[in-house]
Amino acid sequence: MEQKFIIHIISIAAMIALMTSCASGKIVLSNDANISKYKYVIFGKETSGDRELDDVVMSVQNQIAETNLTVLSPSNTLKIFECSDSILSPNIHVTSEKWDGGHTYITVTFYDYNTNQSVAVIKSSGIGMTVSHDQSIALNAIRKKINELFK
């Protein structure tokens, strides 16, 4: 009897753990966007949100840099002039609820460097057992969507 009770408790705990860890993500492209024409990315004024989350923002930047996009320095004006019609500039926004079991949301909006028109928006969210777990789940979800779009 006691063994059945323990197995029952373990099964309930496993179901709760599975139900409390959730990720979602999506990509929205502008109607006339030809994402394949973009070969470069310039980081700059790309962040907004809580400065405490700069580590998450840096992780998203690293994920973007690991794609097929080549990172350009804003000071490389000659290369920017040559390639300006194929450069994206991302705005990365991260919010994280400060309690365990809260959400972390990551939104990356890619803008055409020349026109400042939004080309693509990638969103992810994560719900986990702790704040760091939320962030890890959201980062994994955004990584998948970034790779889906640019690799």
Regions found by a protein language model. Give the residues of each.
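Sec-dependent bacterial lipoprotein signal peptides
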Residues: M1-A23
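A structural "domain/chain start" motif
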Residues: F5, T20-L69
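Residues embedded in well-ordered secondary-structure elements
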Residues: S11, D32, E97-W99
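C-terminal/domain-edge helix-coil "capping" segments
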Residues: A23-N34, Q63-E66, T70, Q117-K151
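A short, hydrophobic beta-strand-centered structural micro-motif
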Residues: F43, S73-W99, I106-T107
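Solvent-exposed, acidic/flexible segments
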Residues: G49-V57, W99-T104, G128-L139
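Amphipathic beta-strand/beta-sheet edge segments enriched in Tyr/Trp
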Residues: K98-G128
